[in-house]
Amino acid sequence: VSEKMEEAGLLAQELDDQNTNRQKATRNAQEKAEDSILAGEVSNLISSFDEEYSSGIVGLVASKLVEHYYRPAIVGSIEGEFIRASCRSINEFHITRALDECADLLLRHGGHSMAAGFTVHKDFKDQLLDKLMVIADRELDGIDLRPTLKIDIELLLEEVTPRIYPELEKLQPTGMGNPAVLLALKNVDLADMQQIGKEKTHLRFKVPGSQVEQAIAFNQSQWYETWLSQRPKFDLAF
């Protein structure tokens, strides 16, 4: 915090640089983790450990892996004789209870159903993963591991107007116990799609026939080539 404009500007630039470096490190670690995962079979629980992973980003990388593969994910930073790991999970798998079953192998652990962390001696890594894999196979047996969205209301194009926003505001505050309403448009055309962001990972587009001037889909750039070559109709959740 600074009351001097010049100093505040320098501090803001420093924070922006740190954020950019953190994002780059997260992307690099995610790519490396995905390479190691795809080198084998994608199982009910995925993991990646490396000396190059910073302990400050392993949770972010694990979250990205869960988002992409919809599997419980463990990402760990190897620091000398020890591994410090972050876990992110899915609704169907209580990650901390799984770690509780492996407490004899861990130096420390803690968390809740969807996220946890632990420290383990690197000599016990393989034994730990084997045990966690048995637990994951047991708990997730027969479950269709595909991410789902619970749509509250499906709208018609002509219903997407500025008038819906005051109605949604009446439902605030949202959060645990009162999740935000999820709306959907199905089978709609998209126009003027562009890849945006420093890494071109987001999409910006228009929805013809609606009052939506512009929409942004974060981390959905994989659909750009499909739109460009096929011009399919899309289902949108927002």
Spans of features found by a protein language model:
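OB-fold single-stranded nucleic acid-binding module
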Residues: 124-130, 223-224, 230-237
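Beta-strand/loop nucleic-acid-binding surfaces
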Residues: 210-228
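Hydrophobic helix-and-loop "lid/oligomerization" segment in the mid-to-C-terminal part
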Residues: 1-123
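A glycine-rich phosphate-binding loop feature that marks nucleotide/adenosyl-phosphate handling sites
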Residues: 32, 51-52, 79-81, 117-123, ...
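Long, low-complexity segments enriched in small/aliphatic residues
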Residues: 156-207
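Short flexible coil/turn linkers enriched for glycine and charged/polar residues
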Residues: 39-43, 52-55, 67-69, 79-81, ...
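OB-fold and OB-like beta-barrel modules that bind single-stranded nucleic acids
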Residues: 110, 168, 190, 231-238
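A common structural junction motif
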Residues: 103-108, 134-141
